[in-house]
């Protein structure tokens, strides 16, 4: 019989290799699932299928996993390397798969009793033939059930390119023996647990059935909240109930997605072509976190940072290829233009207006629609920043969607809701040229199909894209920890804890996004070149600086989730030089090569520097203090950092608390000393003159931030009673003048939002009294600290401009 099965598998192998593509999930199971290939592995499959076996085996061999067709040999005993939990619809029958599997499990357990060093790993594996969840009003089932030979043939032809082999987290048999013993009941329990795992996996791979849009509309329009809103609309506008109902239907039709699985399959093919045209690859990290939440039955809300319109497509594409369900995506109403709007809607987009203010009917309908998505178990994605960042930094969170998410949790949400922060990064953003024009004052160009096609047509060879899933926030756990009485409040009204909870969770999402930053060659090369006042460095200086950056990021990690480039400084530079439309040039003179950034590209490059500015701001501040003082006691350096840190923390969403900050600063000092960038003797720090250029380049990372802070506190010294609005306006005007006089190219330098954030942080840190008047002694102390870290030339320009402004206004 074994020979017949082998012949049958060989016959299947040729057509399947032509029809079915290798799509393993995860892409690198050995690394991502922490598999120990030096210990025996047993693959656990849900049911007998020779077709599935051939596909699964081919993936194993391509991934460097042990061949499932061969046997494990342990202490002279040979046992199968795979088991089936159930009979499938197969030609070759044998004794029951259940009994056979239990017998094999028992033999492996017996070997664990006699060999203490043995640790067999059980790896659940399933082959997913297509991912359609089916429709609510139809009886069709997803193609994850048992298929007979004819059905498998059609599945291979139709779904061959969409067939995935899913490897799950291994179960340690050694752990099972230690925790539960090794009798026959344990073998049966293992089989039951594996069956439950496969059942959950089916749901996590396809998601709930797609809704009947009309039936969903009818249900929502009958909900109490929307009926009340329709009645209020009719009264307030003096129109009939029927007319108000038509308006409600029109709003719902404008908002709601119209997901089509066939459309998702089509866009998957388009996106494969697009990524191959534009990018050299998509680097995905920590997707196991999300798969774990999906298997545990969590309602998942993806909250990515927003760099580009292409973010909408990228995250859905990545999730689909990680064996997860693409989410329903909250997209700006500006993207609802022909034909893109209809296409996006079929891919899961639901559209949201820029503001709900004053429109109670729209607000009620949108809130109920979002709550219905959660209730039905669909994953959701929204961009908490509200729009795309034009500067490359995270924007302050807009809390409206988070507020509605918490309201859904309040109102009878039975499944746990987990927020998954997502860092999305690119070595070249499609719209970066447009952002630069907008920051220089150009009007925002309205989105249309022609604009999208023109942008894509012009671009290629844009390097890599990055998606890193940050630390999830399970809302019920977070609320229980920080707001213990959240369940006891009256759910009909907004309780006292609600607004602080929304604000705190939104801020924590931003912090977790920054903790998951993916550093790339563009970020590092751009940071180094922009740190030089002339935007140019010798090749040797640049490589030395890149090495210093790399060493510090590795030896003093910002967080365990940060992803670092695993290449040499030389390779980083060559990679950036090979990218299109970057503006990094090589010039030669008698002394060697100079790497220079074109002036016109300086604003573009600040975008990529700003992506990782939060990683470098503390080392930069340490470098800046030591450089300006030349020699300083550690205690004094720490005091200066403690004064400035709350403002950096608020602006850049840094995650260190007071104790963690002290540890991080000491580690940075030790790393600078290890690199010989500074001298460290007991409590005394000083510059190392032979490496002062490295320290200068490090210090540049906070140069413009400290200058901005100094502008605002100097105005407050001169005008302690100035209003907040006037303070923001005058700070912005002084910064604009400073940028012209001193050639500052950073687009955020005179951005009103960063001054608004700094002033809000001043208030939070009690630099204003209850009446809003400046606490002068605190402001003067902060101004004194800042003035020691800013060049005399800048200080004089700031003071002179403020005095001139006073003279003009008096």
UniProtKB/Swiss-Prot annotation:
Keywords: Acyltransferase, Cell inner membrane, Cell membrane, Lipid biosynthesis, Lipid metabolism, Membrane, Phospholipid biosynthesis, Phospholipid metabolism, Transferase
GO biological process, one term: CDP-diacylglycerol biosynthetic process
Reactions catalysed according to its record: sn-glycerol 3-phosphate + an acyl-CoA = a 1-acyl-sn-glycero-3-phosphate + CoA
The keyword Cell membrane belongs to this UniProt entry's keyword annotation: yes
Motif annotated as HXXXXD motif, chain positions: 305-310
InterPro entries: GPAT/DHAPAT (IPR022284), GPAT/DHAPAT_C (IPR045520), GPAT/DHAPAT_LPLAT (IPR041728), GPAT_PlsB (IPR028354), Plipid/glycerol_acylTrfase (IPR002123)
Keyword Disulfide bond: no
Membrane topology: Peripheral membrane protein
Disulfide partners: none
Localization in the cell: Cell inner membrane
Transmembrane segments: none
EC number(s) given by UniProt: 2.3.1.15
Pfam family, one: GPAT_C
Molecular function terms from GO: glycerol-3-phosphate O-acyltransferase activity
HAMAP family: Glyc3P_acyltrans (MF_00393)
Stored NCBIfam families: plsB, PRK04974.1
Record's comment describing the protein's domains: The HXXXXD motif is essential for acyltransferase activity and may constitute the binding site for the phosphate moiety of the glycerol-3-phosphate.
PANTHER family: DIHYDROXYACETONE PHOSPHATE ACYLTRANSFERASE, GLYCEROL-3-PHOSPHATE ACYLTRANSFERASE
Identification of the protein by name: Glycerol-3-phosphate acyltransferase
Species name: Haemophilus influenzae (strain PittGG)
């Amino acid at each position: 019989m074994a020979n017949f099965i082998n012949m049958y598998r060989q016959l299947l192998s040729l057509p399947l290799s032509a029809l079915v593509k290798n799509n393993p999930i995860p892409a690198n199971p050995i690394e991502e699932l922490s598999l120990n290939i030096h210990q025996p592995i047993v693959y656990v499959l849900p049911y007998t299928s020779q077709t599935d076996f051939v596909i699964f085996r081919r993936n194993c061999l391509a991934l460097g996993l042990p061949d499932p067709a061969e046997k494990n040999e342990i202490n002279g005993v040979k046992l199968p390397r795979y088991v089936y939990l159930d009979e499938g619809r197969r030609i070759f029958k044998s004794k029951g798969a259940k009994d056979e599997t239990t017998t094999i499990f028992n033999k492996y357990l017996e070997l664990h009793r006699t060999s203490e060093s043995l640790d067999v790993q059980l790896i659940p594996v399933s082959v997913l033939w297509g991912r359609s969840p089916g429709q609510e009003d139809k009886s069709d089932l997803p193609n994850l059930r048992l298929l007979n030979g004819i059905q498998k043939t059609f599945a291979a032809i139709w779904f061959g390119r969409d067939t995935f082999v899913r490897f799950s987290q291994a179960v340690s048999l050694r752990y099972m023996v230690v925790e539960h013993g090794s009798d026959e009941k344990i073998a049966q329990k293992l089989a039951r647990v594996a069956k439950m795992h496969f059942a959950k996996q089916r749901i996590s791979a396809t998601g709930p059935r797609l809704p009947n849009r009309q039936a969903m509309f009818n249900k929502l329009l009958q909900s109490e909240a929307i009926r009340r809103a329709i009645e209020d609309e009719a009264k307030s506008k003096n129109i009939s109930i029927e007319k108000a109902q038509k308006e409600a239907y029109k709003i719902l039709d404008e908002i709601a997605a119209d997901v089509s699985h066939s459309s998702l399959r089509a866009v998957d093919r388009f996106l494969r072509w697009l990524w191959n045209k534009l990018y050299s690859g998509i680097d995905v990290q920590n997707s196991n976190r999300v798969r774990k939440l999906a298997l545990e039955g969590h309602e998942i809300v993806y909250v990515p940072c927003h760099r580009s319109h292409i973010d909408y497509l990228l995250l859905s594409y990545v999730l689909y290829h990680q064996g997860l369900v693409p989410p329903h995506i909250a997209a700006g109403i500006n993207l609802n233009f022909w034909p893109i709007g209809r296409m996006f809607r079929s891919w899961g987009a639901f559209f949201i207006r820029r503001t709900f203010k004053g429109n109670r009917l729209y607000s009620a309908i949108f809130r109920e629609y979002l709550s219905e998505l959660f209730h039905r178990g669909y994953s959701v994605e929204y961009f908490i920043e509200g729009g795309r960042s034009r500067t490359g930094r995270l924007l302050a969170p807009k809390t409206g969607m988070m507020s509605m998410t918490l309201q859904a949790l309040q109102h009878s949400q039975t499944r746990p809701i987990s927020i998954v922060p997502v860092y999305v990064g690119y070595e070249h953003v499609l719209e970066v040229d447009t952002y630069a024009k907008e920051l220089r004052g150009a009007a925002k160009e309205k989105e249309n199909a022609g604009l999208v096609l023109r942008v894509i047509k012009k671009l290629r060879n844009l390097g890599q894209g990055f998606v890193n899933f940050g630390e999830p926030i399970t809302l019920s756990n977070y609320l229980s920890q920080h707001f213990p009485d959240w369940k006891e409040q009256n759910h009909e009204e907004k309780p006292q804890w609600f607004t602080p909870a929304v604000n705190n969770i939104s801020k924590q999402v931003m912090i977790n996004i920054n903790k998951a930053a993916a550093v790339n060659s563009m970020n590092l090369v751009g940071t180094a070149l922009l740190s030089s006042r002339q935007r140019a460095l010798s090749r040797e200086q640049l490589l030395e600086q890149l090495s210093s950056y790399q060493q510090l990021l590795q030896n003093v990690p910002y967080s365990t989730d940060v992803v670092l480039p695993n290449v040499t400084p030389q390779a980083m530079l060559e990679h950036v030089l090979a990218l299109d439309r970057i503006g990094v040039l090589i010039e030669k003179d008698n002394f060697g090569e100079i790497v220079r950034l074109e002036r016109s590209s300086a604003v573009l490059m600040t975008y990529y520097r700003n992506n990782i500015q939060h990683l470098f701001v503390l080392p930069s501040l340490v470098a800046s203090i030591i450089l300006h003082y030349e020699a300083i006691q550690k205690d004094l350096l720490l005091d200066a950092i403690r004064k400035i840190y709350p403002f950096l923390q608020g602006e850049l969403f840094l995650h260190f608390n007071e104790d963690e900050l002290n540890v991080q600063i000491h580690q940075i000092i030790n790393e600078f000393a290890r690199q010989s960038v500074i001298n460290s003797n007991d409590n005394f720090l000083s510059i190392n003159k032979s490496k002062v250029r490295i320290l200068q380049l490090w210090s540049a990372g906070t140069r413009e931030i400290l200058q901005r802070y100094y502008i605002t506190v100097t105005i407050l010294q001169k005008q302690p009673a100035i209003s907040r609005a006037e303070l923001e306006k005058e700070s912005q005007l002084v910064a604009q003048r400073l940028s012209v006089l001193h050639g500052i190219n950073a687009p955020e330098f005179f951005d009103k939002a960063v001054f608004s954030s700094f002033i809000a942080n001043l208030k939070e840190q009690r630099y204003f009294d209850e009446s809003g008047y400046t606490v002068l002694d605190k402001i003067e102390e902060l101004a004194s600290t800042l003035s020691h870290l800013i060049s005399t030339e800048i200080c004089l320009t700031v003071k002179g401009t403020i005095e001139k402004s006073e003279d003009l206004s008096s």
